[in-house]
Amino acid sequence: MAPPAPLLAVRGSEGLFMVNGPPSFTESAVFQRDSGRNCKAVAFSKDGSLFAWCNGEKVNIVNVTSAGLLRSFDLPKVVCLEFSPKNNILATWQAYSAAKDGTAGAPNLQLYDVKTGKCLKSFIQKKMQNWCPCWADDESICARNVNNEVHFFENNNFNTIANKLHLQKVNDFVLSPGAQPTKVAVYVPGSKGAPSFVRLYQYPNFGGPQSALANKSFFKADKVTMLWNKKATAVLVIASTDVDKTGASYYGEQTLHYIATNGESAIVQLPKNGPIYDVVWNPNSVEFCAVYGFMPAKATVFNLKCDPVFDFGTGPRNAAYYSPHGHILVLAGFGNLRGQMEVWDVKNYKLISKPVASDSTYFAWCPDGEHIVTATCAPRLRVSNGYKIWHYTGSVLHNYEVPSNEEMWQVSWQPFLDGVFPVKAVKYQAVPSELPSAEPKPAQAYRPPALRNKPVTSSKLHEDEPPQNMKPQSGSSEKPLSKTALKNQKKHEPKKAAKQEAKADCSQESTQSSASQNTPRSAVPVVTSGDPEIDKKIKNLKKKLKAIEQLKEQAAAGKQLEKNQLEKIQKESALLQELEDLELGL
């Protein structure tokens, strides 16, 4: 059975509607468009089977497949919605308002049982940041940060606090994904000269510092972002300060830390100074990508030892996105950058395509691991709103533009559980599309009339660094040199360079004399398919045909050939046909 086509939910001033994913791209006839202009929030369940939205009057829950209305709640002011991982609970949040007499206002965070429609619990949650309770994937545990301590509830029983994690002032926490046992990463900011720290615990072992799985302390941290990998074996911590005391940046200072559940921790050494724009785990949980440094930014893949594996060089980028299967990586520059994207094959570290999505404010992978949506949404940009659906090879398959008097606020793919979509082999040739190429023409710099017939001089502020493989080559036993050895090496480098230059001059003269005697028959341009496997086959076929040509020359000169050599000559026509077929497929 073929996997389903994911839906794309679109929310804007035109209302709320759903679009069928590739290959049809038509509006879904199953989900009835909500034409209200006041749709404030939408949410899919984790498996994509349920969909909830608030239209300014009610919060509705429907079954995505049948579009049958399951529940409806009279909550006109709700601005945030989220389902629990197993679809048992719908969490809703609306802005908190105190009572007129100055006493505490009504609870603004509600947890509803999706099956019965009953409100299980209401809380007062003043801040919108981190408003939603966190669940373990099996919903055995639910946690909230209340007055600088973490409260844990078990089996969705919100009337009894099963456990508390109390430290000096817990500012933030993140539950690990995946199966039991659940782990918790907590952040406590520094105070009175004491450093900030992040600790990892295994639920419910919170009894003192010795019970922590790992601990990492640091001084430069006003706020942190904690990122678990999919297997819950390690956390990446981006520590940020609001002010950079060195004066190098207006936007503070960032450092990247690695903490593993086995107690190991390290600072990830980033080769270029500057801000950290984005850090993302590969879904395989054994490597991560960081985008960092003053523009043009560097992007590097690191392993679990925090050693660089591959450096993508520098470029106009500030974001990284792994595909759901982890086999493709997109590096992109959105926001104040032009929207240039680089699509990389992660296995071979080979560039697949370089599309440009100008003025994009949103990017997301489709759950099938083949398609991408980029969108220009309000209020970030209020003009040219719309979205495009791409194939990762660079082809635009669908383009939707909002009328000039309307706005689009949000687009969201229907999620699916892991394993629904199989991994497909990476393609390098652009898939066919009925839409024209989206590549903009490069803008020409103005040249005054006096300079128009003269050669152009380079006016680059900097040279972009090329990508390079950082893995140590197999067979090389080179060890890192000590400071003394490096100093001696620098001393001898000028002499060594002079010798090599002299040798090069001699060899150049001899090469020129031999080249004048032996002119090549024909210069054949090297054609590549873009697919490493096909290129390898073509190379091997040409090698075999060259050997057959040599055997034919030997036979013409009167040499007696062996039986196996004659058999090789007989295969020439078949090899030529195979080569022609491969080259036609380029």
Curated annotation (Swiss-Prot):
Locations of Basic and acidic residues compositional bias? 495-506
Write out the coiled-coil annotation as residue ranges: 532-583
- Tell me the Gene3D superfamilies matching this sequence: YVTN repeat-like/Quinoprotein amine dehydrogenase
Role this protein plays:
Functions in the early steps of protein synthesis of a small number of specific mRNAs. Acts by directing the binding of methionyl-tRNAi to 40S ribosomal subunits. In contrast to the eIF-2 complex, it binds methionyl-tRNAi to 40S subunits in a codon-dependent manner, whereas the eIF-2 complex binds methionyl-tRNAi to 40S subunits in a GTP-dependent manner.
According to the UniProt entry, its GO molecular function terms are:
mRNA binding; ribosome binding; translation initiation factor activity; tRNA binding
Q: Name one GO biological process term.
A: ribosome assembly
Annotated spans, Disordered: 434-531
Q: Compositional bias (Polar residues) at which positions?
A: 470-479, 507-521
Which species is listed as the source?
Gallus gallus (Chicken)
| Top-rank lineage group of the source organism | Eukaryota
Q: Which Pfam families match?
A: eIF2A
Give the family this protein belongs to, as stated in its UniProt record.
Belongs to the WD repeat EIF2A family.
Q: Does the keyword Coiled coil apply?
A: yes
Q: Which UniProt keywords apply?
A: Coiled coil, Initiation factor, Protein biosynthesis, Repeat, Translation regulation, WD repeat
WD repeats (start-end): 23-63, 125-163, 356-401
Q: Which GO terms describe its cellular component?
A: cytoplasm; cytosolic small ribosomal subunit; eukaryotic translation initiation factor 2 complex
Q: Which InterPro entries is this protein grouped with?
A: TIF2A, TIF_beta_prop-like, WD40/YVTN_repeat-like_dom_sf, WD40_repeat_dom_sf
Identify the SUPFAM superfamilies for this entry: WD40 repeat-like (SSF50978)
Q: What is this protein called?
A: Eukaryotic translation initiation factor 2A
